[in-house]
Amino acid sequence: MTSNSHVKIGIIGGSGLDDPDILEGRTERYVVTPYGKPSDALILGKIKNVDCVLLARHGRQHTIMPTNVNYQANIWALKEEGCTHLLVTTACGSLREDIQPGDIVLIDQFIDRTTKRVQTFYDGQPTSPPGVCHIPMAEPFCSKTREVLLEVAQGLGVKCHTRGTMVTIEGPRFSSRAESLMFRQWGADVINMTTVPEVVLAKEAGLCYASIAMATDYDCWKEHEEAVCVDNVLKTMKENANKASSILLTAIPQICQMDWDSTINAHKSMSQSSVMLPKH
């Protein structure tokens, strides 16, 4: 089967997973959006002959804390660059015994505990699109894209949990033990600081969005386990980053071989029909 020329993959790399060396023939492009500048330059190139655009969520030097990431500009820039899919990576803490440090989780739901972030492109600013967008979030992630990632992970022999609920906290601090225990009671499986509002904005943009979450620790709910700290997170990420990279490098050419017309049209249709325009 020939490759699908309509598919372009945006990759948003989280902690330790934003290496531009995965791209062939790469060039950099600095852009400005109606929402300001993205976290860093867009890095354009190919992965196994598939057009891709890489963006470091926290900047290439990891200088932007989760609250200050310009999620609006990041998603807008990737959409304007022609991306149809967003494959993102994120470090996370595990809230479940069976999700061990180093495991991959293909999250399918989220709980939002952020407090300081704009979650829509339709924010009433003069340079923003008109109207109010009430985007449905019953299924926040693209199920078809998730299925591809799952099949690839299983084929590579990577330990991968097929679904999971991510609770996104504001940060940059980690949770208290009481919070961590509460999130477990709520049904959350993993915890991070970036999934929201990124997934919401991708849904508004009509993109096929899926997240590869890598557990680095057990947060702090396990009383006899060392609580999460930066050193342990970075150590686990360094040891296991190749898992996420392998999934991406294998999945991207497979995605490009598939027919995405109906899926892309469905995402776009939902995005467009969710906007209530002002009456004249």
UniProtKB/Swiss-Prot annotation:
Catalytic activities: S-methyl-5'-thioadenosine + phosphate = 5-(methylsulfanyl)-alpha-D-ribose 1-phosphate + adenine
Pfam family name, one: PNP_UDP_1
Residues involved in phosphate binding: S15, R57, H58, T90, A91, T194
EC class of the enzyme, as a word: transferase
EC numbers on record: 2.4.2.28
PANTHER family to which the protein is assigned, alphabetical: S-METHYL-5'-THIOADENOSINE PHOSPHORYLASE
The keyword Nucleus is assigned to this record: yes
Residue(s) at site: Important for substrate specificity: S175, V230
NCBIfam families tied to this protein: MTAP
HAMAP family for the chain: MTAP
SUPFAM superfamilies, sorted: Purine and uridine phosphorylases
Subunit structure: Homotrimer.
Residues that coordinate or bind substrate: M193, D217, Y218, D219
Organism: Danio rerio
Protein name listed in UniProt: S-methyl-5'-thioadenosine phosphorylase
Pathway annotation: Amino-acid biosynthesis; L-methionine biosynthesis via salvage pathway; S-methyl-5-thio-alpha-D-ribose 1-phosphate from S-methyl-5'-thioadenosine (phosphorylase route): step 1/1
CDD domains: MTAP_SsMTAPII_like_MTIP (cd09010)
GO terms assigned for molecular function: S-methyl-5-thioadenosine phosphorylase activity
